[in-house]
Amino acid sequence: VPDAAAHAVGAGLDLPEGVPLFLFVGRLMWYKGLRIILDAMKLLKDGGYDFRMVFVGKGTDGDEIKAYAKELSLGDKVFFAAPAYDRDVVRAWYCRADLFLFPSTFDTNGLVVREAAACGLASVLIAGSCAAEDITDGKNGFFIEENAASMAALLKKLYGKRALLRQVGENAQKEIYISWESSVRRACARYEVVLENFRRGLYPPHDAPSDEFYRHVSEYLAAVNRARSGLLELRGDVQKGCAQLTEKLDDLWDRFL
């Protein structure tokens, strides 16, 4: 991505040249570890560090996350950009940033980490998380513990070390990023292994369900439906009884009170 395009993507935001830019791309959901990011940014700001943090995306927790950033007085450091659906725009964000922050333990395999690596951008990840698979700490990415203090400590340690960040990002590009061509080749190779094992009889045959099995399933479903019908009938009787009781109470109220 040309430098002009990378800088144009942040137009309208206060992103000074030379100031470290941290990036998150994805859905704005608390379970992705975004509270860790915001709390870490607060620690950096309180420590006198100058930086910028940009969230690119949207989500059902977006309003709460923005409100929390405001509560932490991070309005001059943290910005929320609109979700990017154009690949060139997403790529420009990756090329514009200095570090990609992804402290999620929810994601099984962070595709955004691969996207960042494709653009030569190193990621900060939770040690032991699924997203950290294939990452070697300090070589093609960085690990932290699952808390804001750990993230802030790492970012302080890396502050101003742009040459190191570029080198780790280049390593990520070489070692983590997998092109579609490579992915297809890997998938085909695995399918060939499966087919060959099948031809050699290495997979035990699976018996098809018997008629008796289906009969038991049918009886079970019939019993469930009968129980459901009984519960619905009972609910109707209870509602009818409650209505009658309410009517009698109202009558007593009118007579004696």
Task: Provide a role label for each language-model segment.
Residues P20-L43, Y49, M53, T60-K66:
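A conserved mid-protein helix/loop that constitutes part of the nucleotide-sugar donor-binding site
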Residues V184-L257:
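C-terminal amphipathic helix plus adjacent low-complexity
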Residues K66-A84:
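Nucleotide-activated donor-binding/catalytic signature segment of Leloir-type glycosyltransferases, i.e.
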Residues P83, R91-A97:
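Short alpha-helical donor nucleotide-sugar binding micro-motif in glycosyltransferases
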Residues A122-I126:
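Short hydrophobic beta-strand element within catalytic cores of glycosyltransferases
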